[in-house]
Amino acid sequence: MKEQKWIHEGLITESLPNGMFRVRLDNEDFILGYISGRIRRSFIRILPGDRVKIEISRYDSTRGRIIYRLRNKDSNY
């Protein structure tokens, strides 16, 4: 059975080494996010200030996988 995950939107606040980022979620929580393989293969640039969709495991809510970078028109803000 596939693991259930939460999907949230957030803002990249800090870039860390090895494709890791500090992400502030819309509910004001800070988590550590890493780039998914699909984004890494497509050479999509993620910079501080970008809005992203992040997938968070139910078992470890302090880390998440960045699955999509939102364009300005995709964002709610």
Swiss-Prot record:
Source organism, top-level taxon: Eukaryota
CDD domains this protein is in? S1_IF1 (cd04451)
Please name the Gene3D superfamilies in this protein's record: Nucleic acid-binding proteins
- The S1-like domain covers 1-71
User: GO terms for molecular function, please?
Assistant: ribosome binding; rRNA binding; translation initiation factor activity
Top-level taxonomy? Eukaryota, Viridiplantae, Streptophyta, Embryophyta, Tracheophyta
Q: What does this protein do?
A: One of the essential components for the initiation of protein synthesis. Stabilizes the binding of IF-2 and IF-3 on the 30S subunit to which N-formylmethionyl-tRNA(fMet) subsequently binds. Helps modulate mRNA selection, yielding the 30S pre-initiation complex (PIC). Upon addition of the 50S ribosomal subunit IF-1, IF-2 and IF-3 are released leaving the mature 70S translation initiation complex.
The record's annotation in InterPro entries points to: NA-bd_OB-fold (IPR012340), RNA-binding_domain_S1_IF1 (IPR006196), TIF_IF1 (IPR004368)
**Keyword annotations for this protein?**
Chloroplast, Initiation factor, Plastid, Protein biosynthesis, RNA-binding, rRNA-binding
Protein name, please?
Translation initiation factor IF-1, chloroplastic
Location in the cell: Plastid, Chloroplast
Pfam families in UniProt: eIF-1a
Annotated source species: Brexia madagascariensis
Q: Which family is annotated?
A: Belongs to the IF-1 family.
Which residues span the membrane? none
User: Does the entry feature the keyword Protein biosynthesis, yes or no?
Assistant: yes
Record's GO cellular component, any one? cytosol
